[in-house]
């Protein structure tokens, strides 16, 4: 019987392959979608903005591998950051969403690391907790 949960690394590889299928946006298309989101709260426009920047999230998240946390979790937190960036992005300021989003993605990942990472690792199962 197959396991209902696929192998983690295979899942991450598949996710990284899937995000490559989303097209990158031109400056004009990005501005048009950002204005549609800002003015009419068009969720389709926001979805296209988020999905077109998932590669940026993965790139930034993989740079935080050295903390011993799962890369999939770092990417998930980065995805929260890109959603926050799209929500707050002002296209009239004259810069690209990727420039603005980079700061929100990093902030979300760093907050997750601070909440999750510890120099002293605490036992997670009963056998590890009995050790001390």
PLM features: what roles do these ranges have?
Residues 2-132:
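Alpha-helical promoter-recognition and RNA polymerase-docking modules of transcription initiation factors
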């Amino acid at each position: 019987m197959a396991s209902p949960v696929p192998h983690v690394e295979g899942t991450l590889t598949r996710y990284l392959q899937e995000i490559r299928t989303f097209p990158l946006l031109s400056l004009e298309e990005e501005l048009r979608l950002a204005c549609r989101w800002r003015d009419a709260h068009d969720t389709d426009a926001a979805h296209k903005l988020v999905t077109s920047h998932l590669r940026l999230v993965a790139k930034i998240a993989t740079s935080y591998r050295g903390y011993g946390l799962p890369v999939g979790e770092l990417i998930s937190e980065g995805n929260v950051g890109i959603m926050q960036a799209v929500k707050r992005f002002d296209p009239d300021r004259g810069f690209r969403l990727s420039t603005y989003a980079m700061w929100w993605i990093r902030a979300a990942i760093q907050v997750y690391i601070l909440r999750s990472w510890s120099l002293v690792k605490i036992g997670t199962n009963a056998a590890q907790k009995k050790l001390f």
